[in-house]
Curated annotation (Swiss-Prot):
GO MF annotations, alphabetized: beta-galactosidase activity
Catalytic residue list: 186, 264
Documented EC number(s): 3.2.1.-
Keywords in alphabetical order: Glycoprotein, Glycosidase, Hydrolase, Secreted, Signal
Lineage: Eukaryota, Metazoa, Chordata, Craniata, Vertebrata
Protein role: Probable glycosyl hydrolase.
PANTHER family: BETA-GALACTOSIDASE RELATED (PTHR23421)
Main localization of the protein described in the UniProt heading: secreted
Signal peptide boundaries: 1-27
Biological process, per Gene Ontology: galactose catabolic process
UniProt xrefs under InterPro entries: B-gal_1-like, BetaGal1-like_ABD1, BetaGal_gal-bd, Galactose-bd-like_sf, Gly_Hdrlase_35_cat, Glycoside_Hdrlase_35, Glycoside_hydrolase_SF
Protein name as annotated: Beta-galactosidase-1-like protein
Glycosylated sites: 97, 243
């Protein structure tokens, strides 16, 4: 959409958002009409066709763009979670600023003429770190999450007494745009089946929000038994490959009267590192939607726009083995990770138009894309060389290794250090018993990288060393479990490592603040560190480069690199794992880049091995499946100091 047209549309929608907040709330209602199996909005029959978008996966400056595209697609509502850990990073410390400004997002939804279906948890899944629960809950190691454990309920009550009053003015009957609120999330898939816990939550919602707001639950068909609760409207979730008739028939056993609701109709699926990129065919998704709409059902499409797991926010599953989720949350959704309409969107819009009016006019085109590079990175230094800056308070000492949670390290990395108590001449097995590495350990002896020990593997490393040799183990938290009957997912070294027949003790733990180093120290002129002859293991690389023209959205491609973390101008883009796949590029929104000759800085923490030429490129198309062949556009080997982004920039789309 051209900027002028976008501005006009927003000005037309502005009166609606203001109207939503006017004190005429007593005439507004959203209720279940059980006699006619439907919803009523202000007394009139109503059916929502909704889509999921997560504000915490989309930078704030892009909220309006994504929401307007959803409205133009024919949706009349959006559904989204509220991740507790995103807003209460430490007990009693709350953050609702910037991209965490929930009220601003509700207002943007109102500007786009979208009603809201809110899912505040406390547990959300969402393939998000620890399912949205804050990891500081695990500082009490015996806590039972998602149960009526008094410690857990006390933390939930404290959080909801902050959150729910904020959203109270935005309830539909109060003049806002929130028509319904979900209690918990797919609780029937959890092992506890604690109805006392669910009743406590329902009572808390009612006490803080009143009796008028519609409260509901969502579960897969197998979870309805433990997930539903009297007094909460029961909904179900399933995808296009599932038997709609069978599932809705089962739903009627729990909710005999009222509208049929699929709260998560899957337009795609998530990706795990090491597995193929997931897709769902356009024909299957559109056919399933049309069949549900013919039944009069209300439907939310999960996801309509997936977004990105920036930083360390991805979650993980455990299906026989630990499965961390990729940085991209594209989800094969109707709106791509970069915010572009896909063929799936146009097909879904055609289906929706058969059942309700859709906004007139063409959908906005794809955003401009940019190509740049290759950019040659310079070696900054080994991670161990910056230890004083990474952990300015110094180490924590303990006989046995301590977990991330015990030392209050929520995300990222922690270094464990001990010293060899005797000389080892022959290669000697090193391992951590009982799968006690959560999640990946990068092992070094006197600064020399030895290899990796990880959560899913039983392989051992073989080490040698002298009396007093320094044994360093950098442990990476790859994301806490986010779904299902998961137990508490502690991170770090859960068991003391063993070298030969010796249990290693006398540990120092260094909780690392890598983001602070990248953001505040690396822009300064740091002293020169001695470079290793053949760098391997956890090492920083960096490069400043100008973009001479205007900027566009782009995708960072790291051919030959192994695994690590990337920052652009101090912003943590997230993890790359080129060697594992399927994701090969990282989405870089254009607002992160400085145009017209200003210097940009890219920083990599490569954890294992670097390519012979430490180069990266910025592409105009993503590569989300490593098994697919990249259509390579010829890139001239110009240095980043002279390449103008305005020349190779072109629109990418359909």
């Amino acid at each position: 959409m051209a900027p002028k047209k976008l501005s006009c549309l927003r000005s037309l929608l502005l009166p609606l958002s203001l109207t939503l907040l006017l004190p005429q709330a007593d005439t507004r209602s959203f209720v279940v009409d059980r006699g006619h199996d439907r919803f009523l909005l202000d007394g009139a029959p109503f059916r929502y066709v909704s889509g999921s978008l997560h504000y915490f996966r989309v930078p704030r400056v892009l909220w309006a763009d994504r929401l307007l595209k959803m409205r133009w697609s024919g949706l009349n509502a959006i559904q989204f979670y509220v991740p507790w850990n995103y807003h209460e990073p430490q007990p009693g410390v709350y953050n609702f600023n910037g991209s965490r400004d929930l009220i601003a997002f509700l207002n943007e939804a109102a500007l786009a003429n979208l009603l809201v279906i809110l899912r505040p948890g406390p547990y959300i899944c969402a393939e998000w770190e620890m399912g949205g629960l804050p990891s500081w809950l695990l500082r009490k190691p015996e806590i039972h999450l998602r149960t009526s454990d008094p410690d857990f309920l006390a933390a939930v009550d404290s959080w909801f007494k902050v959150l729910l009053p904020k959203i109270y003015p935005w309830l539909y009957h109060n003049g806002g745009n929130i028509i319904s609120i979900q209690v918990e999330n797919e609780y029937g898939s959890y092992r506890a089946c604690d109805f006392s816990y669910m009743r406590h939550l329902a009572g808390l919602f009612r006490a803080l929000l009143g009796e008028k707001i519609l409260l509901f639950t969502t579960d897969g068909p197998e979870g309805l038994k433990c997930g539903s609760l009297r007094g909460l409207y029961t909904t179900v979730d399933f995808g296009p490959a599932d038997n709609m008739t069978k599932i809705f028939t089962l739903l009627r056993k729990y909710e005999p009267h009222g509208p049929l609701v699929n709260s998560e109709y899957y337009t795609g699926w998530l990706d795990y590192w090491g597995q193929n990129h997931s897709t769902r065919s356009v024909s299957a998704v559109t056919k399933g939607l049309e069949n549900m709409l013919k039944l009069g059902a209300s439907v939310n499409m999960y996801m309509f726009h997936g977004g990105t797991n920036f930083g360390y926010w991805n979650g993980a599953d455990k299906k026989g083995r630990f499965l961390p989720i990729t940085t991209s949350y594209d989800y094969d959704a109707p709106i791509s990770e970069a915010g572009d309409p896909t063929p799936k969107l146009f097909a879904l819009r055609d289906v929706i138009s058969k059942f309700q009016e859709v906004p007139l006019g063409p959908l906005p085109p794809p955003s401009p894309k940019m190509m740049l590079g290759p950019v040659t990175l310079h070696l900054v230094g080994h991670l161990l060389a910056f230890l004083d800056l990474l952990c300015p308070r110094g180490p924590i000492h303990s006989i046995l290794p301590m977990t991330f949670e015990a030392v209050k390290q929520d995300h990222g990395f922690m270094l464990y250090r001990t010293y060899m108590t005797h000389t080892i001449f022959e290669p000697t097995p090193f391992w951590v018993p009982n799968n006690g590495v959560h999640d990946r350990a990068y092992v070094m002896v006197d600064g020399v990288f030895q290899g990796v020990v990880e959560r899913n593997m039983r392989d051992k490393l073989f080490l040698t060393g002298k009396l007093g040799s320094k044994l360093d183990i950098l442990v990476e938290n790859m994301g806490r479990l986010s779904f299902g009957s998961n137990s508490s997912d502690f991170k770090g070294l859960l068991k003391p490592p063993i070298l030969g027949q010796t249990i290693l003790t006398q540990w120092m733990m260094f909780p690392l603040k890598i983001d602070n180093l990248v953001k505040w120290w690396f822009p300064l002129q740091l002293p020169k560190w001695p470079y290793p002859q053949a760098p391997s293991g956890p090492t920083f690389y960096s490069k400043t480069f100008p973009i001479l023209g205007s900027v566009g959205d782009t995708f960072l491609y790291l051919p030959g690199w192994t695994k690590g973390q990337v920052w652009i101008n101090g912003f943590n883009l997230g993890r790359y794992w080129t060697k594992q796949g399927p994701q090969q590029t990282l989405y870089v929104p254009r607002f992160l880049l400085f145009p017209r000759g200003a210097l940009n800085k890219i920083t990599l923490l490569e954890l294992e091995d670097v390519p012979l030429q430490p180069q990266v490129q910025f592409l105009d198309k993503p590569i989300l499946n490593s098994t697919s062949t990249l259509h390579r556009t010829h890139i001239n080997s110009l240095s980043a100091d002279t390449l103008s982004a305005s020349e190779p920039m072109e629109l990418s789309g359909h």
